[in-house]
Structures are given as C-alpha cells and as structure tokens.
C-alpha cells in the first residue's frame, strides 16, 4: 500500500506540476481549453500511470499461471481489483491535496499529513488525557474512525495471506480481507475527485507559489500547526521535565502548550506570509483566541468535562480485561464484573489515591 500512495503522489505532482510555477500556470490556462477539460485530461493521464502497470502485471501473472497449469487465477483478479481500488483512492486524494497548495514542496508534506492527521491527533489527545486525567492509560486503540487515516488503516486492514490445510503442510488457497474497506475508499474517491475539480475550477492563478492556495484554509493551517505542532512538542518537553523535576503535570503541560503552540502558530503565519513580520492587530487577536481555546480545552480535560475518568463500560461490551502490575494479567470472563467493581472503587477513591501518589 505504501508504494501505491507514493506513486499516486508522484503522478499527481507530475500532471499538475504547472500549478506550482507562475509562468507555466499562466501559459497552460491561456490555452483555448476550459478548466474542466484541463482537469479531466490531467486527471486521467495521471491515473493511467498507476493503472496500466497494474494491468500489465495482472495479464503477465495470468499468462505465467496458465503456462504452468495453475488454474486458481481468480486470486490474481482479486489482487487487481484491490490494487485498482486503492490506487484510485490514493490518486484522488493526492489530486485533492495538490489543489490545496501552490508550492511543490508543500504538497508531499500535506499528503503525508492528511493520511496521518486523524490518528496523530487521537494519539496526542490520548497522551494528554493520560498525563492530566486520573487513571487514564496512554494506550491508543484503533476504531472505525481510524478510516480517516487511510494509509495507516489500509496497511493494517488490507491483508492477503496463504491458507493451509489442517496440518499446515500444503497451501490450499489464499485469504484476502479488506474488500469492503477498499470499496468504501473507492466510493470516497469519487466524491474527492469531484470536490477536487471544484477547487481547481475556482483556484486563483495568483496563488501559485503559496503554501496554502485557498484563503479560507489559511486560519485552519495556523490553528492546526499551533495545536498539533505545539501539542507534540509540549508533550515531549513535559515528559522530559517531569522525569527530573517534580511539578504539577497540568500546569507544566499548560505552560508548554501555550509557549510552543504560540511559536508554531506564528511560524505557520510566517510561512504563509513569506515574511518574518507577522505581528499585527488582527493576527494578535486571533492568537489570543487560539490561546484561550487551548486553555479551555486543557481545563476541560483537567476537570473531566468529557467524562473520560468516570467512563465505565458495560460488562457486555468487554471482550477481555487485564490488570496491569509489573506485567499484564489476563482476567477470565467470569471475573469481568469484579474488575468493573474495582475500577468503580478506584474512581470513587480518586482524592485518596492522589493524596498519596
């Protein structure tokens, strides 16, 4: 899956490279073609770069199987469908990302960020919760929302393997999982393709060279840079400081989050403006709002507005339970109600435990 996404990004960059050079952009858009025709031509050209090699590999594989009297060629067809679906989605996403920027170096970075932004944010939130919330683990588990990080989700859920007989001696077939996932992403690719077209249709040529080519997304770029960049640095520095200095975790994280979040916020603005002079009344007011939102969110975690500390699942929702000491101890299904009662007791005794530890 990773090579497919890399090839998709390269193909999108190749066919839409004229968007990142002012001279080329003006020349291409001066041709007697409307943007719909340009978009379709370039889009199809880029996808052909991905699809044709897969088709050739499929045909070659079928010929090799037939030459060696191997009749189970349906697995090659499944592989071809899976790869075509993944390629379609990866390429559609790459084209969409290509429309968001006018900088050829920013596009690969955005493409990587889009593929891992959701899972990265969830892991960051989990680490913040474990640091300032009572009794919350820093272990993150994937869920259905992990589909919003497509590359990671496909790597973990699109699997092909060999099926053996009951004695594990002879291969009897091939197991494939993730077909529904590929179908969902293929449908999403159609929507993304249409959305990317409208972005291209309304794109201003003057934004060539800009890190963010859509004006409405520039505040989003600043805030994501501030929250995600500042949050990651703040977590790393807080963990380092707390290793050697005994200080309140919440106060430590709050201070570092404001400091590094502000640095990342204004650094993002410098990138957008291509200038170090970014302090103006409008931007300072926006920064003040950014700091206020950060402080409010951290305070919400601290006072458990979201009910993270108090959440206890029903016994019917639990497949397995573990008690972590020096090592995890697995609990039988019959003991799950006892574990839930123990969890409830730990929550009720929060103040007593915190006064000791």
Describe the role of every protein-language-model region.
Residues 13, 44-106, 119, 127:
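Secretory targeting signals
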Residues 193-199, 235, 262-274:
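Alpha-helical transmembrane segments
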Residues 1, 116-199, 203-216, 231-254, ...:
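Terminal transmembrane helical anchor/hairpin motif
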Residues 105-118, 281-293:
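Central hydrophobic cores of alpha-helical transmembrane segments
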Residues 34-46:
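Membrane-interface alpha-helices at helix entry/exit sites of multi-pass transporters
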Residues 222-229, 268-308:
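Internal/C-terminal transmembrane anchor helices
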Residues 1-24, 43:
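Long, hydrophobic alpha-helical segments
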Residues 299-357:
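Membrane-interface segments at or immediately adjacent to transmembrane helices
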